[in-house]
Amino acid sequence: MKKAILTILLCGVMVLGMTGCGKSKNEFDIGNKSDIKVSQNDVIMTIKEGTLTNKSATLVLTNNSAKNFQYGNPYEIEIKKDGEWHKINVELYFNMPAFQLSARENKEIEINWENGYGKLAKGTYRIIKGIDYEYEEGKYETFNVAVEFNIE
């Protein structure tokens, strides 16, 4: 009887030990230096004042041109380490609708990255979104916009 209880306790300790060895939801794998080029010409992206937390923000896309653009749900977050931007290795899944950003228009986008990135730790980050411009029917040029932010 004592052996059975001891075996059950030992198994319980092993299971708890194994589950404690993984990464917590607030840690992530920092990848290679980023090679993403960012443009802030016709379209800029900002964070709406008062909306930034360590797990979400409201982005504002502002079209400062007479052109029409499109964007989707995908985004990525990078972290600044030693003065360089680095990718964060996570698997993200997005629905792929296309949204219009008409000439001189602003659009607010609420994002919650907790499921993909977890709660961000103290540091400097940037959110990157791709923007598409149809320069000829069926032909698109894609560029990236980004906004930097700090988590205290």
Regions found by a protein language model. Give the residues of each.
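Positively charged n-region of N-terminal signal peptides that target proteins for export
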Residues: 1-4, 8
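C-terminal motif of bacterial Sec signal peptides marking the signal peptidase cleavage site
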Residues: 17-20
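Primarily secretory-pathway and cell-envelope proteins
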Residues: 22-95, 100-102, 130-152
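Intrinsically disordered, low-complexity Pro/Gly/Ser/Thr-rich segments with frequent PxxP/GP/PP motifs
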Residues: 92-118
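Exposed beta-sheet edge/beta-hairpin loop segments within beta-rich domains
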Residues: 116-122, 136
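A short tyrosine-centered beta-strand micro-motif
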Residues: 120-130
